[in-house]
Amino acid sequence: MEVVKDIAESYGAERIYTVGDVVTQNFFKHGLIPTSAAVDEKTRRGVRIEQLAVFKRVIKVNNPPGYITEEAWSAVEEAVRGGVIIKVEGEEDMLSLAFIKLAPPKSIVAYGHYLGALIALPVDWYKEYVLKLFDYLEKC
């Protein structure tokens, strides 16, 4: 997490969004409060996030694995403004792409890799690639 703090500081991050239960819990554990977060409250590691009350608004959405539903997309649109926890019934992983596309400049999107790694992407550096990726995704 020290690396994430260093990245955020050197990048001048103004907002940090987290996707995933373990990632979000680790941010809280290390004193980094995300601007908004998306969780599904299901993890292989049995993590329970107690600090979710810091978010002003809870949005519950349905989102199947491998998709970003319109409902989930709308929730991310609200979440990038801040103070939102998105509770996903289904799978939240793909929402990291929506956060990268919709987040304002000087934002970081952090999500977990299934093998246990933490990925923290400065959106200004990756937004162009994510926008191209959306050209290949099917609209559902």
UniProtKB/Swiss-Prot annotation:
Which molecular-function annotation in GO is an example for this chain? kinase activity
Instruction: Give the top-level enzyme category.
Output: transferase
Family annotation (HAMAP family):
Dephospho_CoA_kinase_GTP_dep
Residues annotated to bind GTP: D21, V22, V23, D40, K42, E92
Can you say what this protein is called?
A: GTP-dependent dephospho-CoA kinase
The answer to whether keyword tRNA-binding applies is: no
Which pathway, metabolic or otherwise, does it act in? Cofactor biosynthesis; coenzyme A biosynthesis
Q: Which reaction does it catalyse?
A: 3'-dephospho-CoA + GTP = GDP + CoA + H(+)
List, alphabetically, the InterPro entries matched.
GTP-dep_dephospho-CoA_kin
Record key words, sorted:
Coenzyme A biosynthesis, GTP-binding, Kinase, Nucleotide-binding, Transferase
- Look up keyword Nuclease and say if it applies: no
What family does the database annotate?
Belongs to the GTP-dependent DPCK family.
- Origin species, per record, is Pyrobaculum aerophilum (strain ATCC 51768 / DSM 7523 / JCM 9630 / CIP 104966 / NBRC 100827 / IM2)
Entry's PANTHER family?
GTP-DEPENDENT DEPHOSPHO-COA KINASE (PTHR40732:SF1), UPF0218 PROTEIN TK1697 (PTHR40732)
Q: What is its EC number?
A: 2.7.1.237
Annotated function: Catalyzes the GTP-dependent phosphorylation of the 3'-hydroxyl group of dephosphocoenzyme A to form coenzyme A (CoA).
Any one Pfam family here would be DUF359
GO terms for biological process? Answer: coenzyme A biosynthetic process
